[in-house]
Every structure is written in structure tokens, then in C-alpha cells.
Amino acid sequence: MRLFARVMLGRHPCYWIVGLSVAFSAPVAMAADSPLLECAAVVNPTERLACYDRLAGADKPAVDNHPAAAGPPPAALPTANPATPAVPLVMSEPTPMSRLWELETGTRNDVFTLQPYQLMYAMPVKYSDAVNQTPFRGQFHGENGASAQLQDVEAKFQISGKMKVADDLLWDNAAFWLAYTQESHWQIYNHAISAPFRETDYEPEAFLVFPTQYQLFGFNARFVSLGVVHQSNGESDPLSRSWNRVYAEFGLERGNFSLMIKPWWRIPESASSDDNPDISNYIGRGELQGIYRFDKSLISVTLRDNLRADNHGSARIDYVFPIYKKLNGYVQFFSGYGESLIDYNFRQDTIGVGISVGDGI
């Protein structure tokens, strides 16, 4: 024990604790022939230190108690992906012009299907600031036989429809249409002359429609139409009025705005059969129509001009607004010549209110 204490308290004081432990456990260690005594008996300090290290396990590899830093997750094994269901291609909504003239594949109807053409409306009340009495002078008589006058308030209505009779013409690029429009002016409140129809104009026509796809002044050019139209009031002289025209119409669109440009040429008639030789100088030689659609409503402005210095023609404004489903409210304002065929050379301003049904223009 004296040797062990001398060694432990010699040049290495750091082993006092170890030495004290050995001293307190000496009886047991000596009885068990403890290896600590063997290390204590080593004279060389370096070798003695190595001996104690071996006993303490210092020469074993250090064990890292800290978890290893997480690395990237292992790459997933490739697996067969389930088949992705096909998503149907969502097409853009057809424009009003496409629907009216079937300019795209998804808008086409069968031939011989009756469809809207011009606006169909009924105005129970239409007021005129000037009434054309001249053509009817002597035509209407009251109950006492005296000549009666037309009233400045009457009703007006129009029916119109079109039908495609052939498709895929001329290199599969044209459709042939027939159309009919009828407009009536009814002196419904004029009981003095038995509430007659003052004027009814009949307008059948036939035309080819060619779809187009090009840009023009920021507009999408959608179609070109070539047609012939007859318009008459079905009366005999002196009230007969009629004319025949050929026309070209160009349809343009830009957003909610549609523009139709329609020049025409009157087919000449013989002087003996022409009831209204100067009709082009009043009703005009062409028409420009702009339509703006918004919130299921539309405003249409139609301008006609004779393309002469005196600038005769007309302007018409139509306002259509929704009431219930296909039933719409309708307001019409007209100013100029030709509000009807019998009035082709008579100027007046009119305004009327009523209802419109279905789609048109």
C-alpha cells in the first residue's frame, strides 16, 4: 500500500482520486488479485498511464451518442403511374355573329331549320311627329262620309326569320340562306276609319354566306354575304311601292361590338313599271349597322345614306333589354326618310315602345 500511495502521489497528482479508490478497495482488490495493482507496479510513467487507460476503456473507439445528421430521403423507386384521365378541351364561347350565321362547326344547325333573322317585335304604341297624309288622301272616310285623317299614334310590329337550305357549297365554304321579313303599321286606335293597317312591307331575300378569318382595323372579319332582296308593300297604284336590290354585306366583330357594312345596288326597272324611281335618293344606297351587347341587352344603331351631297337617309336606334327568358323590352327611335315604303320620300321622327322575342341581329 505504501508503494501504491507513493506512486499515485508522485509525479501524477491527477490520479489521486484513482489512488484513493484503490486504497479504499485494496482489501477486496488484493484478494481478487486486482489489475489495478499491476498498473500501479509499472515504473515507467507512460506505460503506467497506458495501463490505466486500458483498464478505463479509453483506448476503445469513441461512441458518438449524437444522432447522425439527416440526409436526403432515399429516392423513391420508380412505380408505374396510373393513367391520367383525359380532360376535355374547353372551347371558347361562340360569338353572337357565329351563332347567328353558323360560322363555326359547333354552331351549325340542320338545313331547313327556321331561325331568327331581324328583330321580331311588337310596339303597341309608336308616336310620329309628322304623319304622311298625302298618299292616303281620299282613301279613308269617316262614318258620315267625310275624309278622315291618319293619327300620329299607331302600333307597329315586325316578324322575321331565315332558313339555311344548303351547306358546304363552293369548296365547302359557303351556305345558302332564304329569309323573310314583314313589317306592319297599324292604326289600331283610329276607330273613325275602322283601325286599318296603314302599311305592310314584305321583304323576301336569298343570299350566300362565306365565313372569313382575318383582321381588319382591329376587328375580326367574320363573314361576307352576297344576296338579292325584293321589298314591296303589295298595293296597287297609286299606293304601290317596291324595289329590288343586290347587295354585299361584311360582318366584323370586336369583343361585344359587331359591325355590319352593307352597300347595295338597285336593279333598274322600266319607267312604265317603276312606282318610285327616286327611292335610292331617299332611303339610301348603303347601310352601316353597329351592335353593342352587354348584360343580356343590346343597343343597335343603323345608319343609311344616299351617298349624295343632299345626304338623305335615316338613323334608327334599337334598345333591347331582358324581361323574362326570351321575352325582352324594346324601344325604337327613328329619324329620317323611309320609315316604311309608303314613306320613302317623307321625313319624320318616331319613337315606340313594346316587346321583342327571341334572338336576332
Predicted regions and their residues:
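N-terminal secretory signal peptides that target proteins for export/translocation
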Residues: 1-11
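N-terminal signal peptide c-region/cleavage motif recognized by signal peptidases
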Residues: 25-26
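Alpha-helical, heptad-rich or low-complexity scaffold/stalk segments
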Residues: 31-65
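Membrane-spanning beta-strand positions in outer-membrane beta-barrel proteins
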Residues: 48, 170, 258, 298-300, ...
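Outer-membrane beta-barrel initiation region
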Residues: 61-196, 200-204
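Outer-membrane pore/translocation modules
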Residues: 133-144, 151-152, 166-292, 303, ...
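Long, repeat-rich segments with strong aromatic
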Residues: 287-330, 334-340
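Outer-membrane beta-barrel "beta-signal"
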Residues: 331, 348-361
